[in-house]
Amino acid sequence: MKLGTMVHMRGADLEDKIRQVHENGFETCQICCWNGAWLTDEAADRIRTLCETYQVEISTFWCGWSGPGVWDFAEGPLTLGLVPPEYRFARMEELKRGSDFAKRLGTGNIATHVGFLPEVSGSGEYRAVVAALKHVAHHVKANGQYFLFETGQETPVTLLRTIEDIGTDNLGINLDPANLILYGKAN
C-alpha cells in the first residue's frame, strides 16, 4: 500500500508543498480545496505538471464546499455536507465542479464530507439526501471517477444503507480513523 499526505490549495506555494511530499518520501497525495474560485483549468494543469515533475501521484481530489461548517454535534448536522437543505443545491454543484477539476487533474477519485447522514431511512430528510448524493454520484461516474465519503459522522449501518440506496457502483470510503474516534460512531 502506498502512503501519502494531504496538500491543501491554500497558503504557501503549491510547488513547495508538492516538492515536500516527494522529499519526505511519499509517492502520493490528496489535493484538497475549499475555495471553488481556485478550481480552474490553469490550476489543474499546474498541479498536474508539478506532480509529474516531483513524481507524486494524486490519489484523490478532496473537494470542500461553501457556506458554514461547524464541526461538532450541536451545529454540525445543521451545517455540514449535503444534509442541510438550504445549502444542498449549491454544494451539489460545487462537488460536480470539483469532479470536473479532478478529471483534469487526472485522478479517478473525489472525496468530501457528505454531512451527518440521517439515521432514519424512512424520513423525507434521508430520501432527499440520498437523491442529492445520487445526482452527484452520477456526474462523478460520467467522469469515470469514484465518489468517496469521508466518514465518521454516521453509524456504519447508516453509511452502508445510504451507499446501497444510492445504488451506483462508483461509491467508496475515504477512511479517516480519527473521525471514528472524534464522533464516537465506530460501533
PLM regions with names:
Residues 28-29, 61, 130-187:
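Acidic/histidine-rich catalytic cores of soluble enzymes
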Residues 69-71, 81, 116-122, 181-184:
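A short acidic, helix-capping loop that chelates divalent metal ions and anchors anionic groups
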Residues 117-134:
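Active-site cleft segment of glycoside hydrolase catalytic domains centered on the general acid/base Glu
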